[in-house]
């Protein structure tokens, strides 16, 4: 009995002296070591991977997709220059608008004058043959030649619808026409294309060779007339007889005519 007790004590002492031989304790130690190793390995791997991928991905991606653009700010002087240029362009545009309106107005006036000329041309064309025939029959001309001069006596008989500039041209009849025997300023149409004064109704000095258009107002000034003088003392007022005195009295403009009523 005593020997058995001593043997048991020896076994207990051996177990205490060598704890690693305990299977339960050794198993627990192995599990703790494996847990430490796996924690350190996973922490380092995830930290390095996430750091490298997130750093490289964000750096490279942002650099390639969003390049920096340099913006040069405008100075005050440059802004003032742009503003002045814009004002000049606006002023030029206003001038062009005014010029366009002026051209439209002039074209409207020219169209009206052309229509009036067309009407007058139709009337003259219709009556020209009648007038010529009447003139041949009614005019009793007596010519007295003295050297190079020729005297034409007025007709003594009246021919209906014959062209006249005064009652003397109708014999015993009357020359009907409110403006007959006066200078016709309407023959000069302002702005009408011309190469010479004949296109401006014969008004001497009316054709502007620079613009190639009729400038009737300037022609009045050339003959020492203001617009007031022209409209009150010259146009449809100055006397003429449809002959050579048109050049002197009417400055080349034609003479208004009427028709004889017998």
Curated annotation (Swiss-Prot):
Residues 39-53 have a biased composition (Low complexity). Residues 37-68 are annotated as: Disordered. Residues 1-17 form the signal peptide. Keywords: Glycoprotein, Proteoglycan, Signal. Transmembrane segments: none annotated. InterPro entries: Cpg-3. Glycans are attached at residues 140, 148, 224. PANTHER family: CHONDROITIN PROTEOGLYCAN 3 (PTHR37973), CHONDROITIN PROTEOGLYCAN 3-RELATED (PTHR37973:SF3). This is Chondroitin proteoglycan 3. It comes from Caenorhabditis briggsae.
